[in-house]
């Protein structure tokens, strides 16, 4: 019994540290998922709960120049609100880190498929290419 309690205590004390590890997500961006059939791209997103930070690299083609980029809440085929603004990949590539609320970070980590990366341009101001986040 004592061994079980000690093991349980060790696991419980390690859980917060494990939960704070950065989580790497990806998305394949396609115009067919939004509105510009010629646009393509990729997104690599690293969520760091310990820093309340979302770091990203966006690479796009066929939509230049991009005017905005965001992470939105929304399942595939569903439009949703912006939860993390990103820098637009105006020359085809953008990378950086943005702060995000702990609740947003926890929700994205818990269910990445309920969030998508959307890149906009002047022709398609509501979104040119889009891709759902996945592990």
Predicted regions and their residues:
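N-terminal signal peptide c-region/cleavage motif recognized by signal peptidases
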Residues: 14-16
């Amino acid at each position: 019994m004592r061994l079980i309690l000690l093991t349980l205590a060790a696991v419980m004390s390690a859980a917060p540290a494990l939960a704070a590890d950065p989580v790497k997500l990806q998305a394949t961006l396609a115009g067919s998922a939004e509105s510009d059939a010629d646009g393509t791209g990729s997104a690599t997103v690293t969520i760091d709960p310990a820093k309340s930070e979302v770091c990203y690299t966006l690479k796009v083609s066929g939509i230049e120049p991009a005017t905005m980029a965001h992470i939105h809440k929304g399942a595939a085929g569903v439009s949703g609100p912006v939860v993390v603004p990103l820098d637009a990949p105006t020359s085809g590539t953008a990378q950086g880190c943005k702060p995000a609320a702990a609740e947003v970070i926890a929700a994205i980590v818990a269910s990445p498929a309920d969030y998508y990366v959307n890149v906009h341009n002047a022709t398609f101001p509501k979104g040119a290419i889009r891709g759902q986040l996945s592990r």
